[in-house]
């Protein structure tokens, strides 16, 4: 059994409650940290003829987000320039996207990805769905606050002007971050009632009562919904994912599928998205970068474990096969080594 699997099985036996948030992270706080020393090394790396990308990558992918904020502050104090602006000039392409992503706080990163998804003509629904379906109440509330700060407008307002119909209703309901998070009581009566109502509102009737689906799936707690989807199978000939495919289409179908997969197993959901970003010809780098940057300090160890379990090869191996150069080096550091 590989070390990642050993760690994970030990952690799942002990339960998550007593663990520090970084227990499943692949990027952790650097123990011998000195922001001024890092800022000086970055300044030298940026000024070097041809730019020393390796130093930039090694520093920024081996520090926690909090430490990266300290480095940016020290760099500005030292050079009177913003680190992100200096790196934007020094780097390009996918590597630039990774490094600039790492310099933002998690909520700044999510807010900027959401804004970019809704800017200009057309909407990148895929990004909108991934972020809004997978973040916790606390994360969503923080994203809303930071979005307001950065763009002087409400996230909800932008979602409303950029989407329509039931898809809009689902996105707005999720973005509020009002899901019940009390998991202390298991209400079997309500589990049964919700399962039956999901069935009655969809597969059982002609047409779909989408507002009913939205209410249940955006308001109930994750552990409650996991049990609801299990119970649902005793009413419906199809499981929840199959029912969604039969009942709704387009962006709404995609959003409900993403949401249910996130509720059932968030780390498997991200493993699937990573696999989809690299399978076949070409790479969907935006998705690959966003997940690697946003999950490396959250649950990347669990994602790697789910990835290997489902696809037979490690995430590290896939990244090695699918990317190259300094971009590859940065992603592999975020991945945290071979399983």
From Swiss-Prot:
InterPro entries: Annexin (IPR001464), Annexin_repeat (IPR018502), Annexin_repeat_CS (IPR018252), Annexin_sf (IPR037104), ANX2 (IPR002389). Pfam families: Annexin. Annexin repeats lie at residues 33-104, 105-176, 189-261, 265-336. It comes from the Eukaryota. Its main location: secreted. Heterotetramer containing 2 light chains of S100A10/p11 and 2 heavy chains of ANXA2/p36. This is Annexin A2.
